[in-house]
Design a protein with these regions (language model features):
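N-terminal leader/linker segments that initiate helical-solenoid repeat arrays
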Residues: 43-82, 87
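Short helix-capping/linker turns of helical repeat alpha-solenoids
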Residues: 48, 89-92, 123-127, 138-140, ...
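Short coil/turn and helix-start
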Residues: 73-74, 106-114, 122, 138-145, ...
């Protein structure tokens, strides 16, 4: 951690160190501790965000910041601890909310999962539409699937730049017995996903 050196004067005039005000009569140790505490809080916030990314990054997210973690690799309690801390520090970061939702999904807390995904959607985070589409497509974490809602959400996610939504639509349309079964549509969306695959990784 970098420090700024300040020469203390013998007068009572205030001296700013970091964002705290100290006087020359105050012990420099106290001033230093106050400055360090501010830096430590910032470091902790950054660490919780990085840990949330490390534990629950989603491949479908065009803005993922760490190597993606598949569903089997999710450790629900650890993800919840790290990502809950991250959203407390950065409540407007949609990525952390989506990743928090993955933690809740893993431990089958459906209501908390939906709240986290919906929060990310309200923040305008694109992959939130995809996460909700998968939930309504599969029925995981909710009472029952809603394919109409899933289709709408997949298409909105795709329009917002989430390429994996094309794969979701292909799977939605290629399920025999489903009211959405349509091999022609499935082929169109599969082709769109294949065209993006190299870029998506």
């Amino acid at each position: 951690m970098a420090f700024s050196l300040v020469k203390l004067r013998t007068s009572n005039s205030p001296i700013q160190i970091g964002s705290r005000w100290c006087t020359a009569k105050a012990r420099w140790v106290l001033c230093l501790l106050l400055t360090l505490s501010t830096g430590l809080v910032a470091d902790k916030a950054t660490a919780s965000g990085a840990e949330c990314d490390r534990l629950a990054s989603i491949a479908a997210d065009p803005d993922h910041q760490s190597a993606p973690v598949d569903y089997n690799g999710i450790d629900g309690p650890k993800v919840i601890d790290a990502c809950r801390e991250a959203v407390m520090q950065f409540p407007d970061n949609g990525r952390y909310w989506v990743q928090l939702g993955r933690g809740y999904l893993k431990i089958e807390q459906g209501n908390a999962m939906l709240e986290a995904f919906q929060k990310a959607k309200l923040l305008g985070y694109p992959v939130a539409w995809f996460a909700l589409a998968v939930v309504y497509h599969t029925g995981n974490g909710i009472d029952e699937a809603d394919l109409n809602r899933a289709e709408i959400l997949y298409k909105e996610a795709y329009q917002r730049g989430v390429g994996y939504a094309a794969l979701g639509l292909a799977r939605l349309y290629d399920e025999p017995g489903s009211p959405f079964f349509d091999l022609e549509k499935a082929g169109v969306w599969e082709s769109r996903f294949d065209a993006l695959k190299d870029r998506l990784g």
